[in-house]
């Protein structure tokens, strides 16, 4: 069975880019259209991981192959921001998760108490800001799963995440992280021989899942940014004059590409140092962090 375990809809809130948060959404994917797109691409199960929201559930709750998830924004004890994927939760759990989101240790305790599956997402990306060496110790010791393949991250970022996942013995998660419809289903998690949602999620927990699909790129991100801009204008015609800014989109995404390359090049040798023959060492290289 296959499932894109990281995907966004119109319920992911407003864009976090300065100056755009008042009129541009993070995503313009409508839940029903998202569902149909994922099914047409061969996904056996469907979930939605909106930012700190489960509002998409109202449109999809009746679907037997749907399960509820979310992407929680929180801060590690050192102050750095991370995104945590939480899978197969219910409405009550969502409320408590959001109540605890400002306190990572409290959130971590609750996720374990409820026996929820959760992952640290896009850990070799500067998407959420600065990173510290301590963060990677938390990723090793406080998370059962790591997002090993993300359809919006560069291939080198995904390779580093997959290597970290293998070294630390974590459960691999794969998802498109699609904010634009054309990227939906580009990455997924696959559990062979699973026959239903319960068997799929049990297989993921046991580490039987595989993170598969295509990584992101400069061109893919540029396409998605332009698509989101078009949807913004369609929803808010008053923003039409901003269409003259569209030639700047490749410049913005090029800057993002350069920053992402610098980010992964900085942290990969620190967290995943190679041996003399170029092969990555198998055992964890990160110190233990007390819970």
Which residue stretches match the model-derived regions?
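A basic- and aromatic-enriched beta-loop-alpha substructure that forms the phosphate/nucleotide-
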Residues: 80-94
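A short acidic, glycine/proline-enriched capping/turn motif at secondary-structure boundaries
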Residues: 53-54, 72-75, 90-94, 125-126
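An N-terminally biased module of ancient metal coordination in phosphate/nucleic-acid-related enzymes
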Residues: 1-81, 141, 182, 270-291
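Short, hinge-like loop/turn segments at secondary-structure boundaries
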Residues: 64-66, 84-87, 136-139, 189-193
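A conserved mid-domain beta-alpha-beta active-site/ligand-binding segment of alpha/beta enzyme cores
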Residues: 194-246
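A hydrophobic membrane-anchoring feature enriched in long, contiguous, low-charge segments
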Residues: 229, 233-265, 269
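Short, charged, surface-exposed secondary-structure boundary motifs
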Residues: 75-84, 155-158, 183-185, 200-205
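Domain-core and long-helix interface of multi-subunit machines
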Residues: 3-22, 91-186, 214-222, 253, ...
């Amino acid at each position: 069975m296959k499932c894109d375990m990281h995907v966004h809809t119109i319920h992911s809130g407003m864009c976090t880019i300065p100056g755009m948060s008042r009129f541009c959404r993070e995503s313009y994917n409508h839940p029903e259209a998202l569902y149909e797109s994922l099914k047409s691409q061969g996904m056996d199960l469907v979930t939605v991981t909106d930012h700190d929201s489960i509002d998409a559930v109202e449109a999809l709750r009746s679907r037997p192959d749907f399960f509820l998830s979310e992407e929680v924004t929180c801060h590690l004890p050192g102050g750095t921001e991370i995104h945590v994927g939480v899978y197969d939760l219910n409405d009550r759990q969502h409320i408590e998760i959001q109540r605890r989101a400002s306190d990572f240790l409290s959130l971590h305790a609750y996720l374990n108490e409820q026996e929820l599956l959760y992952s640290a997402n896009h850990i070799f990306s500067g998407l959420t800001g600065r990173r510290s060496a301590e963060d990677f110790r938390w990723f090793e010791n406080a998370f059962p799963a790591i997002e090993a393949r993300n359809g919006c991250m560069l291939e080198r970022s995904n390779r580093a995440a997959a290597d970290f996942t293998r070294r630390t013995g974590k459960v691999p998660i794969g998802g498109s992280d699609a904010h634009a419809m054309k990227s939906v289903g580009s990455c997924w998690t696959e559990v062979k021989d699973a026959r239903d949602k319960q068997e799929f999620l049990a297989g993921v927990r046991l580490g039987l899942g595989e993170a598969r699909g295509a990584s992101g790129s400069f061109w893919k991100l540029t396409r998605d940014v332009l698509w989101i801009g078009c949807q913004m204008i369609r929803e808010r015609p008053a923003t039409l004059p901003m269409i003259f800014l569209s030639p700047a989109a490749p410049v913005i995404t090029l800057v993002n590409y350069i920053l992402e390359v610098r980010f992964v090049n900085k942290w990969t040798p620190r967290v995943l140092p190679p041996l003399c023959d170029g092969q990555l060492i198998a055992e964890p290289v990160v110190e233990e962090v007390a819970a």
